[in-house]
Amino acid sequence: MAIKERVGLVVSDKMQKTVVVAIENRAPHPKYGKIVVKTRRYKAHDEDNKCKVGDRVRIQETRPLSKTKRWQVAEILNTKA
């Protein structure tokens, strides 16, 4: 089975070793055809606390690390500053 990966934007880094990553999904509405943007937020493990708000990161699925955390930061693609 392939490892699931997502690319998103860090929207919160206020927790220790955890970041919240927002991932946008753009899809046409089934009836009206308008492009609808849906945002999903994932908590991801950041072992070294390197991620900052505004960074674009790649996350990958892992074993459950806590009640709500099932993803880990694989790499930082772009930094904000």
Curated annotation (Swiss-Prot):
- Gene Ontology CC terms, in alphabetical order: cytosolic small ribosomal subunit
GO MF annotations in UniProt: rRNA binding; structural constituent of ribosome
Q: How does it assemble?
A: Part of the 30S ribosomal subunit.
Q: What is this protein called?
A: Small ribosomal subunit protein uS17
The domain of life is: Bacteria
Presence of keyword Ligase = no
**What's the gene?**
rpsQ
InterPro entries per UniProt:
NA-bd_OB-fold, Ribosomal_uS17, Ribosomal_uS17_bact/chlr, Ribosomal_uS17_CS
Could you state one GO biological process linked to this protein?
Answer: translation
Q: Does the keyword Zinc-finger apply?
A: no
Q: Which PROSITE patterns match?
A: RIBOSOMAL_S17
The record's listing under SUPFAM superfamilies reads: Nucleic acid-binding proteins
Q: Which UniProt keywords apply?
A: Ribonucleoprotein, Ribosomal protein, RNA-binding, rRNA-binding
Q: Which HAMAP family match?
A: Ribosomal_uS17_B (MF_01345_B)
Role of this protein: One of the primary rRNA binding proteins, it binds specifically to the 5'-end of 16S ribosomal RNA.
Give the family this protein belongs to, as stated in its UniProt record: Belongs to the universal ribosomal protein uS17 family.
